Amino acid sequence: MAVSHGFNLTEATTSVSAPVQVSSGLQIIVGTAPVNQLANPAAAVNTPLYVSTYKEAVAAVGWSSDFAKYTLCEAISANFQVVGTAPIVVINVLDPANKKHITALDETSVQVNDGVAEIDKVGILLEKLVVKKDTTALTADVDYIASFNDDGTVSLALITGGAGDGATTLTVSGSILDASKVTADDIVGGVNAATGAETGLEVVRQAYPKLSKAPGILLAPRFSKNAQVCAALQAKCRKINGLFNAVCFVDLDCSADGAQKYTDVAEQKTKQTATSREAYALWLYVKVGETVYSGSSMAAAATVYNDSQNGDRPVASPSNVTIPISAACLEDGTE
C-alpha cells in the first residue's frame, strides 16, 4: 500500500453552512429574481415558493449578486449566507409574459474565441434568443449550446459539425427580462377581475392554503421605501386568510430623496406612511464586506435567528442583537 509523506493539498468549493431551521416568524418576501435562468420562468412568477436552503432558493428563482436589481437574491443571501436562518417564502413579480418587463436585445455582433461566444448582457430569455452565422439562423442544442455564466451573462458554445462551426463572429438578438422595469404597482399587485389571478402582495394570501404555512414577517426589500408599497405591506399584515396577523419590515428611504441624516428619519417615516403598529421601519442599509444589503432583509433574518435562540418563540426583542455586518451605510453604499 502506498504511503503518503509530507503535506498534501485538497481544494473544495466553499459550501454554505446549514441554516438554522426556525418555525416562527416565517418571512414572505416579495421582489424580483432572475427567473430567465430557469427552464420554465413562468412557473416562478407570482406564486409563493417555499425554500429551506440556498440551493433550493437558487433552483427556484435563479441567482445574481446584483441585489439592487434582484431583491429576492438579496434576501436569499441575507438568510442563507450571512445570518443562517431558514425557511423563507419568496414571491417573484418579474414576469416574462408582461411586455412592460421586456427590453429588446437589438441585433449585435459577438466574437467567437475557441468556439465560444459571450453575450455580455444579463436577463436574456434563451427561448427568445436568435443566433445567426452570417444570414443563417442557428438552432439551439443542434448548432450551439447556450448556458448562463455566474454573473448572469450567456455563453454560446458552437457544436462541432453544426451550422455555426468555424464561425469567427455571430449575430445575436432577442429579448431581455428587465428587472429595472418593475414598479411599485407590480409589488403591490392586484386581482384580475376576469381570471381571479393574484399578483404581488395579493399572493401572500396563498401561503397558507398552498404551503400550510402561516405568515409571520412580510417584506419587499428596497421597494418598501416607496410609500405605496409601504402602505400596502402594512395593510396586508392584518387578518391574512381572515385568521393571521403579521408584521412587516420596511426600508426608510435613505437615498438623495429621503433621510440621509438621522435627524430627518422621523419626518421620512411619516412621509412614507410607516406609522402603524405592524411596521418595523429600518433606516440605513448595511454592508457585509463591500456588499450592500437593505436594512429590511438583514433585520428580518436577524429577528428570526433571535427567535431560534429562544425556543422558536418570538418573545425577545431583536433590538441590540449582534448581526454580522461590516458597516451601516446609505443606499448607494456611502458609510
What are these regions (language model features)?
Residues 2-21, 26-45, 49-52, 62, ...:
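A glycine- and small-residue-enriched flexible loop/hinge signal that marks low-structured segments
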Residues 168-176:
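Short, hydrophobic/aromatic-enriched beta-strand segments in well-ordered soluble domains
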Residues 142-143, 147-167:
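A surface-exposed beta-strand-loop module
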Residues 85-150, 176-178:
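Extended beta-strand solenoid/passenger and fiber regions
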Residues 177-186:
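Glycine-rich, low-complexity segments
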Residues 46, 126-130, 167:
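Exposed beta-strand and adjacent loop surfaces of beta-rich binding modules
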